Amino acid sequence: MLKTIQDKARHRTRPLWAWLKLLWQRIDEDNMTTLAGNLAYVSLLSLVPLVAVVFALFAAFPMFSDVSIQLRHFIFANFLPATGDVIQRYIEQFVANSNKMTAVGACGLIVTALLLMYSIDSALNAIWRSKRARPKIYSFAVYWMILTLGPLLAGASLAISSYLLSLRWASDLNTVIDNVLRIFPLLLSWISFWLLYSIVPTIRVPNRDAIVGAFVAALLFEAGKKGFALYITMFPSYQLIYGVLAVIPILFVWVYWTWCIVLLGAEITVTLGEYRKLKQAAEQEEDDEP
């Protein structure tokens, strides 16, 4: 009886181990950690231009002025753990200085922000191993749509959350609304990763694979925020070594860790589809054997 149970358990866990082995093989072949380092470097160069472009778009729409402030606090509170206040002051100072630039300098900011989009596009298509290239005009349209519509959608989602928060004080659904607001960052991360894995690759991505990969990435991202904040709080070695400059390596490490999570979610999405194809091919070979 015990042997039968062990055989069944081994039979059920065998596909999981095979999939994990395939996932590890792809991570190694794609040099995921090196790719994450490249994206982190480009992200740090593009951070101020990207933020400047985003808040310039909000400034162009007066109805989003209040939402712009909420979005700013939401980003620094939920995407830059532990040191968000310090980084926020520096970035806002840099953005304020960038507003004094000429038209040529503003165009340079936009180009730098688009460079980040291009790097993300290239990295994800390298993971999907897609050799099909989009037309340049189409790629530019996609990048510009992300730059313009992305912040506006985020602002709209924050407006909805503010509306729910106002309902909290005027209804008997306090518990439900509290739970929705508590998981709101996770839902926003999940939707963002799902859109990233579905739209950016130049080949068709099965929707269920993108949903699973995005959910794992969102969970890791939320857990990573809490773990990273706990590490910075409990083991303040960076502050002891770097002093007032500690915010710089902390930002570097966090951006690198974030890109590792994003690329891992992409690898999971790809591996789900690849493993399914390999399994179907193996079953087909067994059926063809006499």
From Swiss-Prot:
Signal peptide stretch: none
Main location: membrane
Xref: InterPro entries: UPF0761_bac (IPR023679), Virul_fac_BrkB (IPR017039)
Transmembrane intervals: 44-64, 104-124, 140-160, 183-203, 210-230, 244-264
Keyword Ligase in record: no
Membrane topology qualifier: Multi-pass membrane protein
Protein keywords: Cell inner membrane, Cell membrane, Membrane, Transmembrane, Transmembrane helix
Gene Ontology CC entries for this record: plasma membrane
Protein name in UniProt: UPF0761 membrane protein YihY
Keyword Cell membrane: yes
Pfam families linked: Virul_fac_BrkB
Family statement drawn from the similarity comment of this UniProt entry: Belongs to the UPF0761 family.
Subcellular location: Cell inner membrane
